[in-house]
Amino acid sequence: MIYREEDFLLLSGLQHFKFCRRQWALIHIEQQWAENFRTTDGRLMHRKAHEKGSSERRGDLLILRSLPVFSASLGVSGECDVVEFRQTPDGIALSGQDGLWQPYPVEYKRGKYNERAGDLLQLCGQAMCLEEMLCCTIPKGALYYGEPRRRLPVSFTEELRQKVRNALEEMHELYRRGYTPKVRTSKSCNACSLKELCLPKLMGRSSVAKYLADALEGSP
């Protein structure tokens, strides 16, 4: 299926969707947003990744920052924090550059790796967009986490790619219907920037205070 540009979803929504389908719908369908420490810190982390300019050359390494990407087959568009192109004999040609180059996307994140987060899906989605745009194969990339200050290498396996496709298909269907799903509450709700908007609607105002108190009590 080929999506029209006006039907493209935001690639960054994969992370929201993996964390919580309801959070994704509140942000991307109902257009609601609220800041907390985590979202503010995350924005600052991305700003640092972009602040050195749009491109940089270091020998056989070309670094592009804030690179817009899209995929008509997936129906998404977004922006890569950093894409590193390393000169290699079996790479692809780049306009204005001599030689052949292999793309390697790098996504910057606050904190440290959490397997429940959608970071892997978001990074893999970026790679799939780049593959479609550049007519190439990208086998791996990396997530950079601000707390340990190091990279986590990521292989874009077929299993991970299929998870991206499945998530985007469900996201497109929910968006088409304009439907905000209900979900079971959990301790992770307490870390969500939208809890004050979401929980009163989801649970009824009388039970929200008790839920938050229980969640805080159970936190380490």
Q: Predicted regions: what is each one?
A:
Residues 1-105, 205, 216-220:
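Metal-dependent nuclease catalytic cores that hydrolyze phosphodiester bonds in DNA/RNA
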Residues 4-7, 170-186:
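Short, intrinsically disordered, charge-biased short linear motifs at domain edges
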Residues 11, 22-23, 161, 168, ...:
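Alpha-helix initiation and N-capping motif
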Residues 17, 28, 163, 167-170, ...:
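Residues that form generic nucleotide/phosphate-binding pockets
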Residues 20, 180-220:
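Cysteine-cluster motifs in flexible loop/terminal segments that predominantly coordinate metals
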Residues 32-35, 43, 144, 159, ...:
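Residue-level signal for alpha-helical context at structural boundaries
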Residues 78, 84-178, 190, 194-196:
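Nucleic-acid nuclease catalytic cores
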